[in-house]
Amino acid sequence: MTALFGIEEVADKTAPVVNSTDCVGHITLQASLDCGLCPGTPVFGGFFDVVASAVSSGIDRADTLSAVAGTWSIATSVTDSIIASDFPYIWGKYCIPGKYFVHEGSPTSASNLSWFVKQFFPDDDRCYDHFESWIAQDTDSNLIFLPYLFGSNLAMDLPGALVGLAGHHTKKDIIAAIYRGIVFSHLVHQDRI
């Protein structure tokens, strides 16, 4: 990998590539004091967050799907092989031998709601309680939120927007539209997988 990027001189400074299920060591006494884990606790190669979510969701075959609603909206599935595609899916080796994970996602999930909270409810510690109450009420479903404040993999210059916003709309309508827009984006990613 270092040769591919033209930085062969750092090859001896990188950690070895291991499988996620390989035991690579144990928690030392000093590490246990620093992090609170018991000395001797095994340490494995591990996963990054989205793959860990898929594993903990029980995803182990192509007809199952993991949906992560974090900062990003991400759908993950598992296949027996990497499938060529013009679309830039993210592929990787899964923890089950002979399996690969495939991700489809974009920054169109909770990052949008967090932006709204920071802009319009910065001092309201109970804003999420209000939101839950508001979305349970009837709201104007013709107000559409495009959750692309932080980008999209649909197009490089696709902006976020509130489409159909009018003077009669309230913050309740806007919150409901944001929630619907986030769910819409999740469905787009799931459909692509």
Located regions from the model:
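Active-site core segments that coordinate phosphate-bearing ligands/cofactors
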Residues: M1-E8, D22-I193
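Short beta-strand-loop/turn "lid" adjacent to the catalytic site in phosphate-handling enzymes
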Residues: A11-T21
